[in-house]
Amino acid sequence: MSVSGGRTRVGRYELGRTLGEGTFAKVKFARNADSGENVAIKILDKDKVLKHKMIAQIKREISTMKLIRHPNVIRMHEVMASKTKIYIVMELVTGGELFDKIASRGRLKEDDARKYFQQLINAVDYCHSRGVYHRDLKPENLLLDASGTLKVSDFGLSALSQQVREDGLLHTTCGTPNYVAPEVINNKGYDGAKADLWSCGVILFVLMAGYLPFEDSNLMSLYKKIFKADFSCPSWFSTSAKKLIKKILDPNPSTRITIAELINNEWFKKGYQPPRFETADVNLDDINSIFNESGDQTQLVVERREERPSVMNAFELISTSQGLNLGTLFEKQSQGSVKRETRFASRLPANEILSKIEAAAGPMGFNVQKRNYKLKLQGENPGRKGQLAIATEVFEVTPSLYMVELRKSNGDTLEFHKFYHNISNGLKDVMWKPESSIIAGDEIQHRRSP
């Protein structure tokens, strides 16, 4: 969905811009043409899934999401398939990652951290009651909706209780090392519920401290710290918070506090609000149909290209901003609130914008690939989480106003923050800041009106 206009339609959904992408899946903004509802659609390539023997994992993810109906968990609406792709239609969350709050503020106040932690425990406790363990809990997988409610995402590595072996333990090592429980690293079998709670404890520490309890550039040294629970709480933690975190980050899973005990903890109970959620009977029998194993072609959807006015792409972008607040499209970078994706406005022609970004990125150690009105910037040097990669796209708002979005597609979020601040200094002549977002809003509204 670039300056050239046009869009793809799948079933009743009109696909828009890319929100994120990984090895096996791409997530796109979409709109239900029947109801007008905005959603996120995860798109998987069937050939890649088959080639990498990912069928079991994808079925597991879909089964997991269908089982969960909770206000603090991303909801799955439906699943579709074409001859070549699988489409998972999910709730669209527009408030960004909880990680963004930590990255921009350094740390949260204890009461704010407790509120998010309570919502996280509500979600995790409910998932466990449905036989689902997340196994990759970390701030990047915790999203916020427009009202600031926490939503747990990414169940791609979850394990249903039916997969527990005869010893009653899970055996697959998953997750991000800094957040993983010691018994998971040992790979001798572990209780999924206790392992998830350890990760929740690390998240609580990060929310309140602004940094990780276990950190080391050497992986074996990191593991040793995790095995020994070698950490110390900063002085600003309250005494009761310190005691609770030490009970959660107990390296012995048999003596580690349980969620039932945690919910009765005095620190946790302060201001606690029980969740309100709906119950639903869920049928998992239709999961096989998305891979068309029966040979039935009638359930397949058709993907087709439709030409549409390119100016609508801007409204699609705006609709993902909180409350249609156009001010969020023209972020003041001095505030430091750069997210995993960020955007700015420009009055320069689209080709000139891309050329200037390309010229600025080269000296910073990035290889640039150019296609239509998109750039892919690939870092030459390995970072903390692999090579940093940034996807850049230009959208036309009006004939004289463009919006430029830069999105991290691989690598470390903090390294992306540093990259964005550095490249911004070289793009000051490209970036346009309106005197008032209301003026920009009026201009866009006039373009939209017939």
From Swiss-Prot:
One of its GO terms (cellular component) is cytosol. Residues 306-331 form the NAF domain. One of its GO terms (molecular function) is ATP binding. GO terms for biological process: potassium ion import across plasma membrane; regulation of stomatal movement; response to nutrient; response to water deprivation; signal transduction; stomatal movement. The active site is at D136. ATP binds at L19, G20, E21, G22, T23, F24, A25, K26, V27, K42. Residues 339-368 are annotated as: PPI. It catalyses: L-seryl-[protein] + ATP = O-phospho-L-seryl-[protein] + ADP + H(+); L-threonyl-[protein] + ATP = O-phospho-L-threonyl-[protein] + ADP + H(+). Residues 154-183 are annotated as: Activation loop. Keywords: ATP-binding, Kinase, Manganese, Nucleotide-binding, Serine/threonine-protein kinase, Transferase. It is an enzyme of class 2 (transferase). Its cofactor is Mn(2+). Its EC number is 2.7.11.1. Induction: By drought stress. Residues 13-268 form the Protein kinase domain. CDD domains: CIPK_C (cd12195), STKc_SnRK3 (cd14663). The activation loop within the kinase domain is the target of phosphorylation/activation by upstream protein kinases. The PPI motif mediates the interaction with the ABI (abscisic acid-insensitive) phosphatases. Belongs to the protein kinase superfamily. CAMK Ser/Thr protein kinase family. SNF1 subfamily. CIPK serine-threonine protein kinases interact with CBL proteins. Binding of a CBL protein to the regulatory NAF domain of CIPK protein lead to the activation of the kinase in a calcium-dependent manner. This is CBL-interacting protein kinase 23.
